[in-house]
Amino acid sequence: MNLEDRQALGELDARLRTMLPEEYQDSYEALQPVPMRSAGLKYGPDGKVAWDEIWGSFCDLAMAGGPPHKGALLEAGTRTAIAARPARYAEVTAELRRGVEMVTELPTELSPTPGWIRVTCLNETMARWLLRAIVMENVAVRREHHMLDLPAAPDFRLDKEIKNVVTVIAKTCHYWLGHTPRAQQRAIGDLFRAMDDESPAVEPAVVEDSGREAVEALAARIAERIATETGLASSARRYDGWLGLECPAERTAIWLMRALVASNVLSRREGTVLFVPVNPAGDPEGDTVVRSVGRACRIAVARGLL
């Protein structure tokens, strides 16, 4: 490993230590993605789910190397699906809002964009940290200032997708509010601002039908450049705003995912497939993503991960 890559590795490690709750700061390299048994639903005297009584503990954060809550990305409903079942969509969003408010004590409302509910965080740093943590749990999420949008769809089921969304916001808020001291939260805010000065955050594009062709074309160009530079082939798995890259092992995908998030590039994984964002507005030619993946892969090779 040359001097430049050693310095880059040291910086990535320092950033991850800053972002992770204290109990993970000295153990995240060795953490294994072992899932916990899913908690069942509990009901109150009114017959409704008692969301705030379900969890006694949570599995490890995906950010720290734990298993993502969802094996595949949980996405928001489409305008067409919502328009076809408005009554059911209203039921789903009402239950999502009730559950989120019970487990986080944060206010919620319907997002201005159909397919999402909006959660108001305590400040922008909290929203930015939760954004990264939730993406890594494989649940779609968007941020506007100190507000987060979480996915909703008329086909969401109480014991499946609704529970998934409530669980993920409960889990990530638990680690932010209960395991991240105020001084560390301030340090995380400083880190985010420093990373923005270096390179603005790259998030997946919000894809409308009219812009899908441009996003897919950019994804193809990014995939070709990454394959040439790193040897990582693109995955057949497709999601709007994401490009999948095949990694040789789960350990490799986890390491690259964290390295990218520490480089201000949102990332997640599904098994051994690493997903990186595609955003024609925020990263028009994909240069930031390609550069960040290339640097992370060089360090991974030097560490024997690739």
What are these regions (language model features)?
Residues 128-155, 160, 253-280:
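Intrinsically disordered, low-complexity regulatory segments enriched in Ser/Thr/Pro
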Residues 2-58, 148-209, 273-306:
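PLP-dependent enzyme catalytic core of the Aspartate aminotransferase-like
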Residues 40-48, 77-86, 112-124, 203-213, ...:
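Short charge-dense sequence patches
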Residues 65, 69-72, 76-108, 199-234:
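Conserved PLP-dependent catalytic core of the aminotransferase class-I/II
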Residues 95, 99-103, 129-133, 137-139, ...:
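Generic non-transmembrane alpha-helical segments
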Residues 100, 119, 148-150, 226, ...:
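Hydrophobic beta-strand residues in large extracellular and virion-surface proteins
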